[in-house]
């Protein structure tokens, strides 16, 4: 669905794993990355990726990286943790080693051996670009059943 510039009430935003996006959208992301990272011209980047100009211009304004911002942002980490002593401490240690500010921590009682936990963190602009690596490190903690992240501002 295309949005008109004045259409702000009907916009809905989602965090979607890039792997499930259609190839045309993934290619627009590649073009944007080339332009941003290599200072390549739009024309050259479009040609290098091999998509049509119309496809690029149709979608380019609707695709932004998750970490794009320019200021500190607050994110919620939603964790499903296997019920074992010290697992939350292990997760917090990973966050501390990454020098990330923790704003709040909420942990619920374990049900069927799994505890839900939410950690509110504040990431600087430079850390936002590393969010995938941070989530990966947290996900490697023994006993993490699931991890999700959402932005809150």
UniProtKB/Swiss-Prot annotation:
Pfam families given in the database record: ACT_4
Top-level taxon: Bacteria
Domain ACT: 76-152
InterPro entries recorded: ACT-like_dom_sf (IPR045865), ACT_dom (IPR002912), UPF0735_ACT_dom-cont (IPR008310)
SUPFAM superfamilies for this protein: ACT-like
Family named by the database record: Belongs to the UPF0735 family.
This protein's name: UPF0735 ACT domain-containing protein FN1487
Organism this protein belongs to: Fusobacterium nucleatum subsp. nucleatum (strain ATCC 25586 / DSM 15643 / BCRC 10681 / CIP 101130 / JCM 8532 / KCTC 2640 / LMG 13131 / VPI 4355)
Lineage, broadest ranks: Bacteria, Fusobacteriati, Fusobacteriota, Fusobacteriia, Fusobacteriales
């Amino acid at each position: 669905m295309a949005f008109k510039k004045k259409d702000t009430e009907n916009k809905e935003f989602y965090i979607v794993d890039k792997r499930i996006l259609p190839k045309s959208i993934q290619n627009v992301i590649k073009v944007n990355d080339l332009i941003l990272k290599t200072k390549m011209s739009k024309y050259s980047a479009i040609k290098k990726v091999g998509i049509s100009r119309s496809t690029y211009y149709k979608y380019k304004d609707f695709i932004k990286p998750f970490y794009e911002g320019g200021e500190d942002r607050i994110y919620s980490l939603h964790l499903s943790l296997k019920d074992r002593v010290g697992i939350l401490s292990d997760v917090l240690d990973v966050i501390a080693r990454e020098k990330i500010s923790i704003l709040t921590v909420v942990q619920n009682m374990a049900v069927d051996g799994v505890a839900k936990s939410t950690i509110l963190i504040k990431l600087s602009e430079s850390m936002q670009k590393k969010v995938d690596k941070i989530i990966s490190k947290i996900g490697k903690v023994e006993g993490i059943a699931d991890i999700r992240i959402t932005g809150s501002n």
